[in-house]
Every structure is written in structure tokens, then in C-alpha cells.
């Protein structure tokens, strides 16, 4: 069953255009509240939801609309103010709440916003739940009596609680003293908590992208604009740089030389660190500590091959961290992620967390006594070209004869030296054309051929 409003990461769009309007968001809050109450085992109890947001100026408006919608359905609300998405997931679980809600459009510019939800366990909710919400949104509202209206209040020290949680995901004796770090908060949800986490663990911290004004989230800073981080690391002669996106659920990492490390490399490093912590080589055949790793259709082939060489199973999920999580839960595995920097370590958190992931990487560096580059010496990624082609309204790229022909030509040219992946974005009107090959020029040539075919269609 298709969904009208929900994409791969909640509901997202331009502010002021359906569905990111105050009236729809109020209806959405009301519908979600009704769904929550219908699932209660005890009708006498009242659900409580947690609402967090990033730093977009539209967050104030949408927060108020959601709050009103929930209250009108008889649901209580706790408000955190600006807080990373994984912080909302953590607090929802830690405080035994009914639902977590995040108002954010992640890495998108400030003119966009979105809403996503977490279960009481701090996990992203399945498609079936979203379909139930969409059906309820279309029904007539069922306002509760005044005596049954929900209440709203601010949650004290939400940021401090999350900071302590992040620190708890690494060994108690871990110290980052002696490390100079540049931390880029993307002018987003982590602008206060990110520098604090690393500072409290002993690092010298230089903050950039930590001065939000409501209009500058992701603007020239953050995980989608790592050039700012590279420049700052080199200017300050820092050891490493850490860039988060607007809601801090993913990261980019830079070393002292300015080299960028993507999510594929960091996922492999996290796997190596856990393998190194296994009690003996006798455990290698079963890999009790790391039986398998989940990537996506976009994960670099070199990672799959390197894991196989170490006896670690690898499975590809659909693109999107929610699908990585579903695969991990189904298999009982712990580690998964995407090249974009969404990394999941279920032994640490229930969802992807840029700060927690960065701490896992730094912990591996500190306790090994080696640099990040040295730890990854055995991994050489295949050249991968990703082109984003904007689709016109109503454009049916699947029916394009020109694209089909360009794809046939590219497959013939690649042979067994590479692979092709063409897929639409789940959040924007874009077609993503990815080619991975043993030769960079070959990958670029094939990707450009197919992208040009889409533009001509």
C-alpha cells in the first residue's frame, strides 16, 4: 500500500506548502494522538509524547501546531526545544513515553521542514503504522471534551540528559585529552550538545557552525558541506574534525591531512574495533561479536569484500537508515549504516546517532594508538560516482527509452568491473544515478551518460 504523506524519513517538504502547513500539522498531531489512544491497553491512562526540533525558524510554528493537535486528542506533550533526533529517540525510551516526535528536515535548507516519529522503544516506526496515521488524517476530527484535553510542558535539562547518555556509550575510562577536535554543528540541533560532549571527555574543542539564527541551518556547514570542516581542521592544526547534519543523526569525519572519511569507511572501522575486542581468534568462524553487518544498495563493494575476507556476513538493505534498522532487528545483528554517514550500533543506541558514532570512532583511535588512516590502511574503496538529476513534475523516468539505452550501453562497458544503481530520492524530486567501477573515469563516463539521458527525457 502506497503512502501519500510519508517518505523514507517521515513527512518532509517546503514550509507553507502541503503538507508542511500549520493546519495539516495540527490535523497530523490529532490523528497520531487518536492512533496512540486506540492502541492503549488501559483506556484510563493518557499517552505522553515528546517533541523535539532543530533550529529552523519554522520549528516554532510547527511545534505549536503539533502541540495543539495532540492536546485536542487528549494526549500530553513534553517539549525539549532544539535537540538532536537521536536525543529524542533516547529520551522517549528512557522516560517510558508513548511516542517521540522530531520536527526537522535533516540536511535540507531552512525553507524545508519535516516531522518524523519514534516508537516507545526509541525506534523508527514501520510503514504499517504510517499508513494507519495517513488513513486517520483523512477522517473527521474527534475532539475530546475539555476535561480530557492534553497538557503541555517543557522538559527540564533535556540536553544535559542526552549529553550524559552519549558519554555513557564509550568506556568509562576513555579520555580524549591531547586531541584537538573541530566540531561542526551545521547551525542545527546539536549546536550546544556536540561541543559539550567532546569537551567533557577531555578534548580541546573548536566549534564551527554552532551559531543558529533560524535561517542558516546546513548553510555552508555540516555533514553536507564538509569543505568548511576541512578548512577549519587545517587552519587550527586539529587532529580530527567532526561534522553533523542539521538534526545530528549522521556525520562526516576529517583527519589532520584534510582527508574525508565517509560512512562506509567508518562502518568498517567500527566493525574492526569490535572484532579486535573479541576474546580470541577461536571465535572467528561464528563471529559471536559481529556475526554480520547491514549496508545498503549504495554501500561500496570494497566494504563487502573486506568484511567477507574477515568472515563477517554482509547484507544490503534498501537505501534509508530505517531499512537498515529493520534488517538489523530481523537478523539480530548490531552494526549497520550508509555511506552518507547514518551509522547504527544497536548495542549503543536504537537509532543512528552522529555523536555516538563519532565517539565509537574516536574510542577505536585512542585505544589502538593508531591514526584513523592507519586503521583503514587495508581498505581501498572503489571509485563511486553519484549524480543527482532533478525530475520535472510528472516525469516518468522508468518509461524513458533514452535512459534504458544508456543503461544498456553502460552495463556492457562495465562488464564485471562495476555496478549501476538508479533510484529516486525518498525526500526530494531527484533521481540518483550511481555507478561504481574499478576505474574512476569509467564510472564518471557511465554515470554522465545516464544522467544526460534522464535530462533529455
Curated annotation (Swiss-Prot):
Please list the GO terms describing molecular function: magnesium ion binding; phosphoglucosamine mutase activity; phosphomannomutase activity
Task: Please list the reactions this protein catalyses.
Answer: alpha-D-glucosamine 1-phosphate = D-glucosamine 6-phosphate
Record's Gene Ontology CC terms? cytosol
Q: Where is the active site?
A: 106 (phosphoserine intermediate)
**Which EC number(s) does the record attach to this protein?**
5.4.2.10
Q: Could you describe the post-translational modifications of this protein?
A: Activated by phosphorylation.
Database matches in Gene3D superfamilies = Alpha-D-Glucose-1,6-Bisphosphate, subunit A, domain 3 (3.40.120.10), Alpha-D-phosphohexomutase, C-terminal domain (3.30.310.50)
InterPro entries given in the database record? A-D-PHexomutase_a/b/a-I (IPR005844), A-D-PHexomutase_a/b/a-I/II/III (IPR016055), A-D-PHexomutase_a/b/a-II (IPR005845), A-D-PHexomutase_a/b/a-III (IPR005846), A-D-PHexomutase_C (IPR005843), A-D-PHexomutase_C_sf (IPR036900), A-D-PHexomutase_CS (IPR016066), Alpha-D-phosphohexomutase_SF (IPR005841)
Please give the cofactor(s) recorded in the UniProt entry for this protein. Answer: Mg(2+)
What keywords tag this UniProt record? Isomerase, Magnesium, Metal-binding, Phosphoprotein
Give GO terms for biological process: carbohydrate metabolic process; peptidoglycan biosynthetic process; UDP-N-acetylglucosamine biosynthetic process
| Modified positions (Phosphoserine) in chain numbering | 106
For this protein, the record's Pfam families field holds: PGM_PMM_I, PGM_PMM_II, PGM_PMM_III, PGM_PMM_IV
Q: Quote the record's cofactor note.
A: Binds 1 Mg(2+) ion per subunit.
Q: Which amino acids does the record list as binding Mg(2+)? A: 106, 245, 247, 249
Job description of the protein = Catalyzes the conversion of glucosamine-6-phosphate to glucosamine-1-phosphate.
The record's listing under PANTHER family reads: PHOSPHOGLUCOMUTASE (ALPHA-D-GLUCOSE-1,6-BISPHOSPHATE-DEPENDENT) (PTHR42946:SF1), PHOSPHOHEXOSE MUTASE (PTHR42946)
The text of the family note is:
Belongs to the phosphohexose mutase family.
Q: What name goes with this protein?
A: Phosphoglucosamine mutase
Species classification: Bacteria, Pseudomonadati, Pseudomonadota, Betaproteobacteria, Burkholderiales
Amino acid at each position: 500500500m502506497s503512502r501519500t504523506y510519508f517518505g523514507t524519513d517521515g513527512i518532509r517538504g517546503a514550509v507553507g506548502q502541503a503538507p508542511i502547513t500549520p493546519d495539516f500539522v495540527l490535523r497530523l498531531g490529532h490523528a497520531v494522538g487518536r492512533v496512540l489512544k486506540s492502541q492503549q491497553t488501559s483506556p484510563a491512562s493518557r499517552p505522553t509524547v515528546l517533541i523535539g526540533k532543530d533550529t529552523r525558524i519554522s520549528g516554532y510554528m510547527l511545534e505549536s501546531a503539533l502541540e495543539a493537535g495532540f492536546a485536542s486528542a487528549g494526549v500530553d506533550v513534553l517539549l525539549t526545544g532544539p535537540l538532536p533526533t537521536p536525543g529524542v529517540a533516547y529520551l522517549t525510551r528512557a522516560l517510558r513515553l508513548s511516542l517521540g516526535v522530531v520536527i526537522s528536515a535533516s540536511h535540507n535548507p531552512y525553507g524545508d521542514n519535516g516531522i518524523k516519529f519514534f516508537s516507545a522503544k526509541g525506534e523508527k516506526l514501520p510503514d504499517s503504522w504510517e499508513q494507519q496515521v495517513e488513513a486517520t488524517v483523512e477522517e473527521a476530527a474527534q475532539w475530546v471534551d475539555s476535561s480530557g484535553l492534553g497538557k503541555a510542558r517543557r522538559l527540564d535539562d533535556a540536553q544535559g540528559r542526552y549529553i550524559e547518555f552519549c558519554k555513557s556509550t564509550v568506556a568509562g575510562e576513555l579520555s580524549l585529552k591531547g586531541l584537538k577536535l573541530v566540531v561542526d554543528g551545521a547551525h542545527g540541533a546539536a549546536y550546544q550538545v556536540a561541543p559539550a560532549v567532546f569537551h567533557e571527555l577531555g578534548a580541546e574543542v573548536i566549534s564551527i557552525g554552532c551559531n543558529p539564527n533560524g535561517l542558516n541551518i546546513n548553510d555552508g556547514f555540516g555533514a553536507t558541506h564538509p569543505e568548511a570542516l576541512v578548512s577549519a581542521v587545517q587552519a587550527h592544526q586539529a587532529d580530527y574534525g567532526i561534522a553533523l547534519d542539521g538534526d545530528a543523526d549522521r556525520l562526516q569525519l576529517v583527519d589532520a591531512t584534510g582527508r574525508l572519511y565517509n560512512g562506509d569507511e567508518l562502518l568498517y572501522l567500527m566493525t574492526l574495533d569490535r572484532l579486535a575486542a573479541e576474546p580470541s581468534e577461536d571465535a572467528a568462524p561464528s563471529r559471536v561479536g559481529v556475526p554480520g553487518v547491514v549496508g545498503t544498495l549504495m554501500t561500496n563493494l570494497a566494504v563487502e569484500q573486506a568484511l567477507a575476507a574477515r568472515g563477517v556476513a554482509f547484507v544490503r538493505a534498501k537505501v534509508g537508515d530505517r531499512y537498515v534498522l529493520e534488517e538489523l532487528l530481523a537478523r539480530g545483528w548490531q552494526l549497520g549504516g550508509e555511506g552518507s554517514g547514518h551509522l547504527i550500533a544497536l548495542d549503543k543506541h536504537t537509532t543512528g546517532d552522529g555523536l555516538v558514532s563519532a565517539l565509537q570512532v574516536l574510542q577505536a583511535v585512542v585505544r589502538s594508538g593508531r591514526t584513523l588512516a592507519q586503521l583503514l590502511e587495508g581498505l581501498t574503496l572503489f571509485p563511486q560516482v553519484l549524480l543527482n538529476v532533478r525530475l520535472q513534475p510528472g516525469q516518468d523516468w522508468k518509461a524513458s527509452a533514452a535512459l534504458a539505452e544508456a543503461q544498456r550501453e553502460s552495463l556492457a562497458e562495465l562488464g564485471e568491473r562495476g555496478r549501476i544503481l538508479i533510484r529516486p530520492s525518498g525526500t526530494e524530486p531527484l533521481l540518483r544515478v550511481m555507478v561504481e567501477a574499478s576505474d574512476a573515469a569509467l564510472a564518471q563516463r557511465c554515470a554522465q551518460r545516464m544522467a544526460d539521458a534522464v535530462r533529455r527525457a
